């Protein structure tokens, strides 16, 4: 098999990275994708750094054994703590994801920029460096959201539980002007509609899925690794939980409009 015909690997701590996979499949419809969700060990956002590194390398080894030509780490937490180590150890294009703060700043709407993310993403040096670029000129507030990925892993993406969780998180901003909300975890796009409801649709909601997918395409094109033939690609999903329910949920989220 030529390298062009090999699949692209995707990895996340659970089902969240499927939000990125959806964007990538739209952008690269001829490609085959292998997605590995580590729902058995989710969430990563409250774990120790070394544990996240070990789990990420285990997942990468699994996907490498399937013959992938590139890897997307579709997990903000795993990107923040392991992306450099991965690139040093594997000789394929490796693309990560980080909170899309730059697009939020470039909107120039005025008002507060809120970054929803896991506690670990917000605690890492990579995030601090990102904040340093803009904190002198912008009103940016990190908002840790522990527990939200676990709800989404159960398939709870709307309804009272999600509404009340988000309402509680955002109630302190009721009297403030919010220009944008950056979704700093790949699970969060699945609750975007409820988030709009809670914030009365007054803020732009931004996630990094499109930017990551565009970077994937750019790197594959520059390396002459894109599939050329006229075909429709396929998506195959694996999960460390190895039960039908989580696989069914994964495909349901992938096909969700």
Curated annotation (Swiss-Prot):
Catalysed reactions, semicolon-separated: L-glutamate = D-glutamate
GO molecular function, one term: glutamate racemase activity
Pfam families: Asp_Glu_race
Domain of life: Bacteria
Binding site for substrate: 12-13, 44-45, 76-77, 186-187
Family membership: Belongs to the aspartate/glutamate racemases family.
Protein name: Glutamate racemase
